[in-house]
């Protein structure tokens, strides 16, 4: 759950590319 929350925030504030690759 923590990772998901962190990813969500990162995706919104940080580069979505990193999150997309990590999530995919």
Curated annotation (Swiss-Prot):
Alphabetical keyword list: Lectin
Superkingdom, taxonomy of origin: Eukaryota
Spans annotated as Disordered: 1-24
Annotated GO MF terms: carbohydrate binding
Composition-biased stretches (Polar residues): 1-18
Keyword field contains Cytoplasm: no
Subunit structure: Homotetramer.
Protein name: Lectin
Family: Belongs to the leguminous lectin family.
């Amino acid at each position: 759950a923590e990772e998901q929350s962190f990813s969500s925030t990162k995706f919104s504030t940080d580069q979505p590319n990193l999150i997309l690759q990590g999530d995919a």
